[in-house]
Each structure stands twice: as structure tokens, then as C-alpha cells.
Amino acid sequence: MQERVVNFYSEGSKLEADYFLPDDYTEGERRPGIVLCHGYSGVRTVILPDYAEYFVAAGYPVLSFDYRGFGGSEGTKWRIIADEQLQDIRNAVTWLEAQPEVDPERLGIWGTSNGGA
């Protein structure tokens, strides 16, 4: 599994994320992608790496990110506003669908706890 830390912007805040690719990925290929969302007051580095490993082993590119104000992302720390988190998810999807490894017509969103609601 290939992994790298990436950043993207959501409404002016820089969000931090992990981007995972399967080891068997072939350049030029476009695969379905998955965005992983952490729960209510979680961070991307707890629990989500296990799920990322599962999805990547199944062949999916995966983006796991911290909402603004959580983990390595900018923003007011630990502030939870559902509308802002929805904007962050939309911007995570936009980032993922722009990656050359990902088929933008085949995307999924998966989350734990409140991240899956």
C-alpha cells in the first residue's frame, strides 16, 4: 500500500489528509475511489487507517481526512458544525475525483460513527 500526506482547502482552511493507493495500481488506470470520514470528535489517524487498509487491499484509492479544526487541519480546534463538516466532505470528494488514479464517476463515501451519518 502506498501512502502519502496531502492537503486540500475547504472554505479557506487547509485540511490534512492521507491518500492511499493499492500497490498493484498501474499508471493511467482509473479506479473507483473512497473518501473516509472520521466520527464526531475523532481524527483520521485513529481507527480509519485499518479501514483504509481494507479498502486499498480491495483495490480502491482512498482519501482519509481531518475535518477543519481536527487533527492536522486548520480551523478552530474541536468546533463541530455539521454544515462545515459537510462542506469539508464535499471538498474531499472534489479533491479525490481530480486525482488521475480515480474514476470521478465511481466514488464512495464511508465513515465511522457521526462520519457515517
Predicted segment positions?
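Short glycine-enriched nucleophile-adjacent loop
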Residues: G116-A117
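Conserved dinucleotide-binding and phosphotransfer motif residues
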Residues: E11, A58, Q99
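Alpha/beta-hydrolase fold nucleophile elbow
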Residues: E101-S113
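N-terminal cap/lid segment of alpha/beta-hydrolase-fold proteins
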Residues: M1-P32
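The serine-hydrolase catalytic nucleophile loop
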Residues: Y40-E53, Y67
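Catalytic nucleophile-loop/oxyanion-hole region of alpha/beta-hydrolase
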Residues: V43-I47, F70-P104
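Conserved alpha/beta-hydrolase
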Residues: Y54-E74
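Active-site glycine-rich loops that stabilize anionic/oxyanionic intermediates
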Residues: E11, R31, L36-V43, S113
